[in-house]
């Protein structure tokens, strides 16, 4: 519970940040609720709008505030921003290729195994490296929410050719490749998917 509270408090602070680059979407800082409700998994990007390396650095810096097991910080990011690397990664995301072909940035998200969920090299409970995946998810959550706060859009893709990505970015064997995240500006306004009712997911005792 403490980790969740810290996570939410940090995200509220992050979404009050403005990237200061003059983007029309960043003219005013959105509220935390606006960030949550406007975030969508975007599958069509505006090819005329680009994102700078400096903006990506600002975005990824926010992920460093994410909580992790014993502050292990197991998540790593590999950023494709050059035309050559973007084209290569597009061929490694299966059926999502056409959906993200106009995204100006593609980010590979990994985590170091044997960190979260371990103490002095020993697994602390039955979840094991599942804690690394959990912490990676928290970090990616910070990424996509900070992206929305900056006026950007994202899509987390689980379909990816891990072996090819590992070779392309020289990712160590000690890291598990979790996802590829596209980053850009939505080309059209996406629909809001139906959500379960609160009573379907919450039980009070």
Regions found by a protein language model. Give the residues of each.
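Positively charged n-region of N-terminal signal peptides that target proteins for export
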Residues: 1-4
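Acidic, surface-exposed loops and disordered segments
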Residues: 17-205
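Hydrophobic alpha-helical targeting segments used for export or membrane insertion
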Residues: 8-11
